[in-house]
């Protein structure tokens, strides 16, 4: 159990710090604001040592919100200096803080410190990702932005066909520039794809997991990389159920008393990019993967809605991928068919007995 809790509200240029001493305080206390840089971090730790009343740094717990890349310098610096860091969802901290009126960086740091103290039993220690995984995430994020720019440029080019009031020479000039921009972006995307493959090949663990994923027919390279990145190479999100929940393909019921009893549905609190990629993988697998195609056709023949069947396929793809990673093996169509047949036979026997 930790004794000294530090809440850090991180922004682009500064970090606001509050602390809570479990033995001597009844509520968290604000410390100061520091620059979001190694110099500021050194000053922060120096001031905290003066406030901790001799509590060893081994008994310290730093907690901050996941703010994208802004909190990475702080977390990496603290871990390099032997500190324990807990990165928590900003939404989780907000919902656990009760009714709030107004906010600022100082108040947020106080709330984060109190959250760390009250919920220390739920603490998940931050572990620095490997250099290869960090490079893969940066390259994949850059590729996604290039694709978004290309899509926007293509839409702009398409809209030129209905543009009115332009002279032919101006229209041709704009179309030419947009076409060149699309070609440039396509070349950059191809270059990033090559870089991503080089990063994967340079790390044996990444390469092994990547090969297991793409062995599932219907799951392409981009979906495989996205799953590796968002799961921390299957170390941050460690189970298929957690991944299904994170991607927004796990269904939840809403029931209360006799007035509320909604059927199970998926939540909008999800990573929609991964969900979109899984949707494309499910559609591809329903046509090209014999195991999933058989399930797709069989379930549709029972009158199930198409959207429900595709969502079930997304879940099955996640479950299969996690099993492949766990067992360190590739996808085997014959084994999956035999396993599915045996499972259906058991279900039929149970229904008959009932």
Regions found by a protein language model. Give the residues of each.
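A detector of single, family-specific signature residues
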Residues: 1-354
